[in-house]
């Protein structure tokens, strides 16, 4: 049976949680393969209950699904325990959550350094969430990180923390004029937190591969989006991991030949949180309309999202970079009540037309959108359950996005609820 990768095709916040939730009843496993609690998924159940998840996979809300925090994720122990407690309080069964022994832990010193670094950079800041994600990945690549399995051996944990703080305390005290952290206090805090999740630690790469061999279906759930990928995104305004499909194999331990479907999630317009280039960004009443109607506030940060028209250049780019086979188009309903809807089909960069993503960072910053306009619609589309039930102009808009993006739009979101979805083609195949 298949391994399906779910990818954000823009700058994150595309509605990946809704897609996971929709597929949940047909999945046996849902896996987070990268990132940390610097991104959020919102899921609205048929009864109206709304859940905001930051670290735990969205499949936790579907009974019978085993959820995995994979080796490519960086885990804040406190956030994990808080999120689990919140789900438990609301009656959600969290017993089927596993934690890769090889995932890295976000330590208190990662958070401290992240926050003071952003403040120090001031206007030149990248716009991180200040949750220690980047510093944790830095330690991982420098081979000095603390892994989940280290909480099972206090001696190893202590050695790693002492070695890390020998250098990081120098940075905190001498560069940023902050207090030094006590190694033993850090160790004690982490071990106390570990008591709440040690029973979940597992060899998840083995379990996932055995599940596929048994014919079970696995969904690999990315956080953030393609344009935030550290290699393929709008560098340096990116995250510290690989949300793209290549990261799914690395961050889960599933071989790439096991992946049968790459489902890209596209918002019917474009949003971005934080700093960085955004060619179709709107600063007028249209931008305000999209932000207000779409409820564009970051789940994790609470920051207002920047809004703009649909950008087909980055959609085509995402299709190629990820090998996307299908798209789930979300928030089409937000565009109702617009007379015309512009679509960015290319960029003007200093007088030269670009139909594909510019190679250089400078060109991306200089890019001005080239628009074509589509007629809008005024009908309420939230009750449409087949493509044919959409207004003709809405159908034409979807078909044009499909043509420009280069992959079939299999699902269309017409509202926030799980049932407010049109399925044109089954993505579980």
UniProtKB/Swiss-Prot annotation:
Binding site for substrate: 299-305
CDD domains membership: AdSS (cd03108)
Active site per database record: 13, 41
Binding site for Mg(2+): 13, 40
Cofactor: how bound: Binds 1 Mg(2+) ion per subunit.
GO cellular component: cytoplasm
CC cofactor: Mg(2+)
Catalytic activity, as annotated: IMP + L-aspartate + GTP = N(6)-(1,2-dicarboxyethyl)-AMP + GDP + phosphate + 2 H(+)
One GO process term, biological-process aspect: IMP metabolic process
E.C. code: 6.3.4.4
Residues reported in the UniProt entry to bind IMP: 13-16, 38-41, 129, 143, 224, 239, 303
Compartments (UniProt record): Cytoplasm
NCBIfam families assigned to the protein according to its UniProt record, in alphabetical order: PRK01117.1 (NF002223), purA (TIGR00184)
Protein name listed in UniProt: Adenylosuccinate synthetase
Organism: Rhodococcus opacus (strain B4)
Gene name, Swiss-Prot/TrEMBL: purA
């Amino acid at each position: 049976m298949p391994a399906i990768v779910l990818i954000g095709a823009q700058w994150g916040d595309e509605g990946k949680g809704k897609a996971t939730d929709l597929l949940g009843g047909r999945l046996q496993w849902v896996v987070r393969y990268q990132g940390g609690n610097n991104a959020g998924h919102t899921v609205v159940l048929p009864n109206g209950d709304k859940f905001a998840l930051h670290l735990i996979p969205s499949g936790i809300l579907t009974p019978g699904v085993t959820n995995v925090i994979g080796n490519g994720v960086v885990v804040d122990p406190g956030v994990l325990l808080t999120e689990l407690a919140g789900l438990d309080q609301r009656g959600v069964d969290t017993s089927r959550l596993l934690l890769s022994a090889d995932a890295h832990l976000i330590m208190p010193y990662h958070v401290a350094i992240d926050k003071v670094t952003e403040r120090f950079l001031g206007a030149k800041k990248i716009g991180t969430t200040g949750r220690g994600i980047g510093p944790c990945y830095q330690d991982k690549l420098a081979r000095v990180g603390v892994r989940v399995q280290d909480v099972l051996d206090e001696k190893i944990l202590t050695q790693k923390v002492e070695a890390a703080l020998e250098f990081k305390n120098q940075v905190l005290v001498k560069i940023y004029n902050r207090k030094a952290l006590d190694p033993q206090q850090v160790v004690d805090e982490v071990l106390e937190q570990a008591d709440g999740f040690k029973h979940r630690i597992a060899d998840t790469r083995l379990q996932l591969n055995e599940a596929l061999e048994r014919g079970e279906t696995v969904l690999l759930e990315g956080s953030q989006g393609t344009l935030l990928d550290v290699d393929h995104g709008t560098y340096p305004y990116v995250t510290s991991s690989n949300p793209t499909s290549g990261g799914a194999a690395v961050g889960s331990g599933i071989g790439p030949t096991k992946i049968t479907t790459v489902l890209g999630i596209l918002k019917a317009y474009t949003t971005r949180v934080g700093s960085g280039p955004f060619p179709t960004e709107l600063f007028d009443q249209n931008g305000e309309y999209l932000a207000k109607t779409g409820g564009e506030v970051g789940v994790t940060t609470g920051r207002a999202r920047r809004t703009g028209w649909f950008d087909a250049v980055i959609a085509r780019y995402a299709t190629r970079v990820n090998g996307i086979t299908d798209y789930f188009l979300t928030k089409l309903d937000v565009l109702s009540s617009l007379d015309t809807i512009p679509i960015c089909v290319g960029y003007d960069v200093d007088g030269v037309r670009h139909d594909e993503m510019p190679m250089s960072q400078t060109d991306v910053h200089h890019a001005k959108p080239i628009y074509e306009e589509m007629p809008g619609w005024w009908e309420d589309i939230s009750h449409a359950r087949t493509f044919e039930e959409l207004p003709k102009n809405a159908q034409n808009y979807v078909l044009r996005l499909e043509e420009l993006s280069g992959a079939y739009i299999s699902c269309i979101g017409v509202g926030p609820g799980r049932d407010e979805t049109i399925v044109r083609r089954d993505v579980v195949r």
